[in-house]
Each structure stands twice: as C-alpha cells, then as structure tokens.
Amino acid sequence: MKRKLVYVCLLAMVAGGMMSFSYDIPEKQETGGREDRVISFPGAEGHGRYTTGGRGGKVYHVTSLEDDGSQGTLRWALKQNGPKTIVFDVAGTIHLKSELRTGKDHLTIAGQTSPGGICLADYGFSINSNNVIIRFLRFRPGEASGKEPDGLGGCDKKDIMVDHCSVSWSVDECLSVYGMENSTVQWCIGSEALRKATHVKGAHGYGGNWGGHKASYHHNLIAHCESRVPRLGPRPSTLALGECVDIRNNVFYNWAGNGCYGGEDQHVNIVNNYYKPGPATKQASKQVQYRIAKV
C-alpha cells in the first residue's frame, strides 16, 4: 500500500511539474512578425499567404460582360485608384479586346462572387502590380487575337496569391507566374495549351514558367501540355534576392516533350508531387516518360 502511495505521489509530482512547466512558458513578446499577421483567406498557404490584396479598400461591382472600359466592366474596375476588391454581379464570358492587366497595387479579384463564374477569353491576363489576390477565374485566351498570349502570366512583382483558377488554351504558356517575391499559386489548373496555333515558332503549347524568391506552387494540376511542365525559370530580379521555390502536392499529367526542367541558380523543393504519363507522353523517349525533373 505504501509503495502504491509513493507511485501516486511521484505521478502527481511529475504531472504537477509538467503542468507548471507548460504554464511557465512565456508568451511571445514579438508583434508585427509574420506569425501575427492575418492570412489572405481561410485556406491560403505558402509564401504568398499573407497577401492582403484590396483588404480595407473600396468594393467595385462588375455589372457588364462588355470590354469597352465603360463603368461596370472589369477593365473599368481595374483602372480605379486605391486598394480595391472587385466582385461580380454577372456571370459568363468576357471577350477581351486586348490584353488585360491588373494595373494597380492592392487588388483582390473575387471571382467566387459571380453567380455562375467568369471566363476571360480571346486575350491573356497579366499580373503587373504588387499585392494582388486573384481567385476563382477561368482564362481561355485561344488564338483569336493572332498573337502569342499566356493564359495567366506575370513576373517581377511581390505579394501575389492565385487561388482556384483554371487556365487553358494558351498559345505560349498556360500558367507563368514567376519571378515574384512572396507568391503562391494554389489549387489551379493549367491545361490544354494549344500546340499548333499562332506562335511564331510553330508547335508550342507549354505549361508554364515557375520560380521566384519565396515562391510556392501547391495542389495544382498541369496537364496536356507539350513541355515546361513546369520550366523552372529564374528572373534577374529574384536571382539577386535568391531564388527559393517550393513545389509540392501537384499533379503533372500527359506531358508530350520535356516535363519539368531548368532550375539554373535556384533552390527548389520538389516534394510529394504525382507524375502520370499519358497518351502524348508515350510518344516521347523512355527517359522523358519517367523523368521527374531535368535540372
């Protein structure tokens, strides 16, 4: 009985010590660090997760599918000054008359607010400003412009979050968001780049260029592209800072030529991705069919 009592006392002392130890851990005194900041939205991950976009700014409503720049169009909303969030009261396809660019810093495009979704067609879309969040949009440039558009592109900016976007039918590359600082591309699809369209080099149709200083690409699907699945492409602006790229939990399917390659002077994590050869891949050499990356 005494031995049992001793064991109980020892357990109580250990438990008490553990409890007192846990309560003695001081709370973090630092404020303003990245850990204390609010993420872009629930589910935002990666190096771009603290992008604020148009938070705290004005809200502009897109009420027209036209692309003439008149009030109520997406092109008009993008030209407005100051932090802004763009929401959609309409659904359907916006047939662009020329390339569309983000234009101004501190921007959120909330495609999920459209009743049935928004598709941008005929020309490419470019991120050419800082602190941008783009969510739930479809990009289908095609070859109608007679040019060589990327579906969704951009480089040399910082604080970028692209989430739940679908990009297809590009002439050059589907999804080329690279050379950014603090960026994330997540839960997106880049597929069916046009192999024989209006590109000056002839057969083309690539997946995209990926890279940047603190750049994350996760939970994306890249499928049915000739090459650059993806191309790890450094930019002079981010090489100076140090290219640090994290590529994980993506699916790469049915590449025809090269799959993933490049990576010059980059530090790249390639983790837990799924590679599945498809009908087009079977026409390539055995080396290309089962190669994860050529760097």
Model-derived features: positions:
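Bacterial Sec-dependent signal peptides at the C-terminal "C-region" and cleavage site
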Residues: 15-32
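Extracellular beta-strand/beta-solenoid scaffold signature
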Residues: 121-125, 145-154, 169-177, 198-212, ...
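Extracellular beta-strand-rich solenoid/capping regions of secreted or surface-exposed proteins
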Residues: 74-82, 94-108, 118-135, 141-158, ...
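Charged/polar low-complexity intrinsically disordered regions
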Residues: 257-260, 266-271, 277-295
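Positively charged n-region of N-terminal signal peptides that target proteins for export
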Residues: 1-4
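Acidic glycine-/aspartate-rich tracts in secreted/extracellular proteins
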Residues: 66-67, 91-93, 114-115, 278-281
